Curated annotation (Swiss-Prot):
<keyword id="KW-0999">Mitochondrion inner membrane</keyword>
<dbReference type="InterPro" id="IPR007715">
    <property type="entry name" value="Coq4"/>
</dbReference>
<protein>
    <recommendedName>
        <fullName>Ubiquinone biosynthesis protein COQ4 homolog, mitochondrial</fullName>
        <ecNumber>4.1.1.130</ecNumber>
    </recommendedName>
</protein>
<feature type="binding site">
    <location>
        <position position="138"/>
    </location>
    <ligand>
        <name>Zn(2+)</name>
    </ligand>
</feature>
<feature type="binding site">
    <location>
        <position position="134"/>
    </location>
    <ligand>
        <name>Zn(2+)</name>
    </ligand>
</feature>
<keyword id="KW-0479">Metal-binding</keyword>
<comment type="subunit">
    <text>Component of a multi-subunit COQ enzyme complex.</text>
</comment>
<keyword id="KW-0472">Membrane</keyword>
<dbReference type="InterPro" id="IPR027540">
    <property type="entry name" value="Coq4_euk"/>
</dbReference>
<dbReference type="GO" id="GO:0005739">
    <property type="term" value="C:mitochondrion"/>
</dbReference>
<comment type="similarity">
    <text>Belongs to the COQ4 family.</text>
</comment>
<comment type="function">
    <text>Lyase that catalyzes the C1-decarboxylation of 4-hydroxy-3-methoxy-5-(all-trans-polyprenyl)benzoic acid into 2-methoxy-6-(all-trans-polyprenyl)phenol during ubiquinone biosynthesis.</text>
</comment>
<dbReference type="GO" id="GO:0006744">
    <property type="term" value="P:ubiquinone biosynthetic process"/>
</dbReference>
<dbReference type="GO" id="GO:0031314">
    <property type="term" value="C:extrinsic component of mitochondrial inner membrane"/>
</dbReference>
<keyword id="KW-0456">Lyase</keyword>
<feature type="binding site">
    <location>
        <position position="135"/>
    </location>
    <ligand>
        <name>Zn(2+)</name>
    </ligand>
</feature>
<keyword id="KW-0831">Ubiquinone biosynthesis</keyword>
């Protein structure tokens, strides 16, 4: 646990230190990301400018996993055609769940911002992959697009990526929340930590979100994806938490 905290701190401080090299863009993007948590452009730019240390970490996570290596090699893209395919899937599939999330929020994959501040091609793809699977993650864990729900997802993604934008989004979003919603952040953090990536003997396997072939599961039952990935959706986590049935094995 202590090593994870140290590693997270290193990635956060490394990202901020690296951002100083692009000071004007950093100041502009960080102001937009913190003052308005719904400022997509500001958040996207801030995420990239502060990402370098975390991106190297994310690349290592992918290279250490067979599916992650395959994703880095093939470099799949989440496109509007991906969503169209998902729309054709029957109820009960992950594709149906993803398409429903996108419809509720009037989203298109093509609406995601391009990568503008990461020069290394491989790291740029890692950042793009993270950005493109964000809606898959929302659909998987069962969280919508309110500020409270978005911050919960950011806490979860922080555990999987170490990107500084996750913590900064939480700091920037807090003033927009009611007191009861602020108190919920502790619960969301508990859920996020319980679902951090791990492949330890005797412990519950949890895949890193970067190493999940989300597109492959679009025509598969949602339950199959949950079983394979090991991440406990929030509603299931809360039920287990209430019943005292949470465990790591």
């Amino acid at each position: 646990m202590q090593s994870r905290v140290v590693s997270s701190a290193v990635m956060f401080l490394g990202g901020i230190a690296g951002a100083v090299k692009s000071l004007p863009a950093f100041v502009t993007s960080s102001f937009g990301a913190i003052v308005d948590p719904e400022d997509g452009r500001g958040s996207a730019a801030f995420a990239e400018i502060t990402a370098l240390t975390a991106l190297h970490h994310m690349q290592r996570l992918m290279m250490a996993d067979e599916m992650g290596r395959s994703i880095l090699k093939e470099r799949p893209q989440v496109t509007d055609e991906t969503l169209e395919f998902a729309k054709t899937q029957p109820e009960g599939t992950f594709g149906y769940r993803y398409a429903a999330f996108m419809k509720r929020n009037n989203f298109l994959p093509s609406g995601r911002a391009p990568i503008l501040h990461v020069s290394d091609p491989t790291l740029a793809y890692v950042m793009l992959r993270y950005r493109q699977i964000h809606d898959f993650v929302h659909a998987y864990v069962g969280l919508g697009r309110t500020i409270e729900e978005e911050l919960a997802v950011k806490l979860f993604e922080w555990q999987h990526t170490g990107l500084p934008v996750g913590l900064m989004a939480v700091l920037g979003g807090m003033p927009w929340l009611r007191m009861d919603q602020i108190l919920n952040m502790g619960m969301y953090n508990e859920w996020a930590r319980a679902n951090a990536p791990r492949q330890l003997h005797g412990k519950r396997f949890v895949s890193c979100i970067l190493n999940v072939p989300w597109e492959w599961y679009l025509d598969k039952p949602y339950e199959q994806l949950v079983d394979d990935v090991g991440i406990v959706p929030l509603d299931a986590f809360l039920k287990e938490r209430k019943s005292g049935g949470l465990h790591d094995s």
